């Protein structure tokens, strides 16, 4: 029986680990969604339900307080419910009329682009996924990985292309045609180059989310697709005997 080459061993181990990861990923997320009512975990899909208006953002010791006019949503949400605000999972602490209040921790202010919200500015909102809901986008946790900056915005006849500058650790976990959440919006990656990636926005997305009002230089919240994080973790953890990227390319990987 012939010995396996280093590349064949790499291929076998990678496929094995990816299979395990995908299985664990599905089981884990299924249990997280089922346990939503017990508040063990919440998930979102990146499909924006409505736009809310900032009434007031008050910075205070340990974080901030955010007041939003959520309109008709005030009849549906409950105290303690989790809502994604521009992609950031926040808990409803009070509802007075159509205005809902949220506390923002210092860590969240550091990671996300919520601290610069201005009065009357619009934000994307999405309620947590419920058992039985359709998954129109992709699994979004509401835990932001960091902030990106709009580098370029090009308007075409029937769509808009927008590119974002991010840290390289973000693009290392992205693939073309993969998913990414930008300000809580589930979008498909069109192109990736070093520390920049781009997405295409259809007219509906431009009119029903905040991205239609964004301009070059504006900050946005970025959440990388969970699968990309898992794959990077596996590749970082495993030792493949010094096989180089060039060797893998030669073998067709």
Model-predicted segments: where are they?
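Intrinsic disorder/low-complexity segments
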Residues: 1-42
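Conserved loop->alpha-helix
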Residues: 41-253
